[in-house]
């Protein structure tokens, strides 16, 4: 009987972990671009006036410049302060091109608002620029 209980608990824990993992990704999300251009402002979150500056502006320069920047308002994942500093692996659904980005801001477009440099690296066929947005998948990853 004790063995059955342990198996039930293990099964429950595995299912919960899978549910959490599934909630940390989304498909066919709209991604627009924003002119953060962090390389022009020494990756200064305060100068960029981004939401996450309150918590992350004093992080080391290497941390701030390691990944491209994005605003996050996607349909799945943490919001507000809980999303700040987290990383996403973003995939252009049209080309398969991938980039890892760091969340530094919020948005209201229901998806991502990528730094223009990241957007351009993902937009390898130029269709996103023509449309003004990309269709992407994203998943939260460790930074």
UniProtKB/Swiss-Prot annotation:
Return the InterPro entries for the record.
Barwin_CS, Barwin_dom, PR4, RlpA-like_sf
Location(s), subcellular = Secreted, Cell wall
> What conditions trigger expression of this protein?
By infection with Cladosporium fulvum.
**GO biological process assignments:** defense response to bacterium; defense response to fungus
UniProt entry keywords in alphabetical sequence: Cell wall, Disulfide bond, Pathogenesis-related protein, Plant defense, Secreted, Signal
Task: Name the SUPFAM superfamilies on file.
Answer: Barwin-like endoglucanases
What the entry lists under CDD domains is as follows: DPBB_barwin-like
Q: Where is the signal peptide?
A: 1-23
The terms under GO molecular function for this entry are: RNA nuclease activity
Q: Which domain of life is it from?
A: Eukaryota
Q: Which GO terms describe its cellular component?
A: extracellular region
Q: Which cysteines link up through disulfide bonds?
A: 52-84, 73-107, 87-143
Residues of the Barwin domain: 24-143
Q: What is this protein called?
A: Pathogenesis-related protein P2
Biological source species? Solanum lycopersicum
């Amino acid at each position: 009987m004790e063995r059955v209980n342990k198996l039930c608990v293990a099964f429950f824990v595995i299912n919960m972990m899978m549910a959490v993992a599934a909630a940390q990704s989304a498909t066919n999300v709209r991604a627009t671009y924003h002119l953060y251009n962090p390389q022009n402002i020494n990756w200064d979150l305060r100068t960029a006036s981004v939401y996450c500056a309150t918590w992350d502006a004093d992080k080391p320069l290497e941390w701030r410049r390691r990944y491209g920047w994005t605003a996050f308002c996607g349909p799945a994942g943490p919001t507000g302060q809980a999303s700040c500093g987290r990383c996403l692996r973003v995939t252009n659904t049209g080309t398969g091109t991938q980039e890892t980005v760091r969340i530094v801001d919020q948005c209201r477009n229901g998806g991502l608002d990528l730094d223009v440099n990241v957007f351009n690296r993902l937009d390898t066929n130029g269709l996103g620029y023509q449309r003004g947005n990309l269709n992407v998948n994203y998943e939260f990853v460790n930074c």
